[in-house]
Amino acid sequence: MNALLSQKLLGYDNDYQLPTVIWQDNSAAQTWTDLETFGGQTESQFPLGQDQAQIQNHYDEETFEKYCKSYPTFHQDLISDKANQVTLDFELDQDIHLNGRAILQLQVKSSVSKGLLSAQLFDFGPAKRLSPIPGMVSRNSLDNGRYYAQENLTELPFTETPYRLITKGFINLQNRTDLLTVEAVTPNHWMTLRWELQPTINKLKKGDKLRLVLYTTDFECTVRDNSEWQISLDLSQSQLILPH
């Protein structure tokens, strides 16, 4: 860091080259590596199924109020397959170093002239993973922290967890091409989406299980709509695409 700051702020020619991508390896504790590029050139495709599926948007009033007051409760029901959702599980038949934006290619229709879709992709099943919240390694071991005080040294714990979020995304069907293009949603008319989820880098190995959850309202991140409509999915014309 000192070499980089000296080069950028002081104009010191020290020939330091910052790697294109610096990535914390999710398969081991305190392991950092550099990558030549962000975004894989190879794609693995996972068909979503053979049938059609429906997602109801409306919840009964008690459940809706519960989710509004506590979105972590909603997320827990989501991973447990208890919310209004479509849940799809996959087992990997090869090692995949996910690099870039996972893509959902979907055939969908809405029962009304609007529509919202949310998606979350999980590394699912008990395994050792990096936790999302840092834990303390050593108390007051860092000098000159906030307000020049000593701070705790923290690190993401590498511990067994039941699942780990890989990526997620949200799409308004009226902006299905891009955010600046408004398109009509014709009720009960099939639409084809190519939907890029949030970018990520994640190392997955053969035999790992992925869980894809598709739903409408996300009580943390989207408008909390409880009106009565549904989204239909033609799973036989839909797939998950992972770049690596």
Where are these regions (language model features)?
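C-terminal, loop-rich substrate-recognition/catalytic regions characterized by aromatic stacking residues
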Residues: M1-H244
